[in-house]
């Protein structure tokens, strides 16, 4: 089996196409370690996100039912949101989102995982917390 090449790509050119509060899009011309070139590679810059898996004392999970324009329909979701500049930590953002979206707060909190939702094109991390009680 061939070993993957983990060397970074060389950026030949980079330009911003959109710069909004919730996301930024840039198009880059890149050269791969083997010499191949990709003339238009799109990178989406987002602030970090938080997810909250919230479970009440009576062992019920809290889900939000809301319309999502990207899907064109309503969707059941766990509590989630953007880490705002005023949030000192991802945990602060998670606590704020849980309260804003459900009215619940307090309880015990544990960082469950940190991952990148789409590391091929997104620059941010998603912090997922388990909130119980």
Language-model regions, residue ranges each:
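Extended interaction-bearing regions that mediate binding to partners or small molecules
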Residues: 1-16
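Conserved Nudix-box catalytic region and its N-terminal flanking loop in Nudix hydrolases
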Residues: 6-8, 41-47, 51-96
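A short coil-to-beta-strand element that immediately follows conserved catalytic motifs
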Residues: 10, 105-112
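Acidic, metal-coordinating catalytic segment for phosphate/diphosphate chemistry
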Residues: 12-51, 57
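Short, solvent-exposed loop/turn elements at beta->coil junctions and helix N-caps
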Residues: 14-16, 113-118
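Conserved beta-strand segments that form the floor/walls of ligand-binding pockets within enzyme
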Residues: 62-63, 77, 97-99, 110-111, ...
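Hydrophobic pocket-lining residues within nucleotide cofactor-binding pockets
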Residues: 83, 115, 133
């Amino acid at each position: 089996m061939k070993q993957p090449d983990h060397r970074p790509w060389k950026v030949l050119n980079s330009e911003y196409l959109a710069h909004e509060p919730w996301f930024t899009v840039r198009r880059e011309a890149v050269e791969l370690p083997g010499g191949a070139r990709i003339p238009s590679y799109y990178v989406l810059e987002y602030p970090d996100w938080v997810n909250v898996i919230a479970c009440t004392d009576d062992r019920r999970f809290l889900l939000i039912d809301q319309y999502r324009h990207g899907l064109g329909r309503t969707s059941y979701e766990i509590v989630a949101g953007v880490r705002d500049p005023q949030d000192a930590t991802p945990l602060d953002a998670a606590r704020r989102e849980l309260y804003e979206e459900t009215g619940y707060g307090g309880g015990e909190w544990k960082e469950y995982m940190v991952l990148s939702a789409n590391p091929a094109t997104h620059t941010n991390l998603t912090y997922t917390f388990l909130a119980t009680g």
